[in-house]
Amino acid sequence: MSEVVVANNANINPSAAAAVGATSVALTLGGSSTYDETSDFEGGYLVVNDATGEGRVYSINYNSTVSAGTALTVYLDDAIETALTTSSEVTLVKNPWADVVIAAAGHVHFAAGVPLVTVGSAASVPQFFWAQTWGVCGVWDDAATAIGAVLQSGTTAGQVEVGDGAAQPVGVQLYTGVDGEYYPKFLTIAP
């Protein structure tokens, strides 16, 4: 799962206007946001959610280093198409496949995929692995599950259960599932 969304990354006013053709946007983050690497938002998105430029989405190439409450500059893959003002509001979205965590109860994350290897939950060093996001995959059932059921992350880390409509669907059950066993699902996270 993607890491928990940081509230301070939403509804941010640019600290300076960004003209058409600009490839960077200066922002001032509030609260406890701390980004100590220039890759924190690499592959993520800057979404203009209100005022001038709203509706535009820009892919982030990289960002400057910053501590809480200070300026952050995001460098974009493409140029600004509609000028941003200091009244524009933007939201920063990290790459959904960066800094993933093992699914836990509460369904507060974006499901990033199903790893086909065991991934440690308390590793102090980053672990790299491939996660399947689409197609037939053996996934651990949290309960008996009927064929055709739409699935979401389960209440036990690493398991899936029948969706309740409140969480992101992750796939469809292909065979009647048994609690605690790995049965085939068709994942629908990202093609």
Please provide the spans of the model-predicted regions:
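Extracellular receptor-binding modules and their adjoining Ser/Thr/Gly/Asp/Asn-rich linkers
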Residues: M1-T28, S32, E37-T38, E54-P191
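Short conserved beta-strand and strand-loop elements enriched in small hydrophobics
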Residues: G43-D50, V90
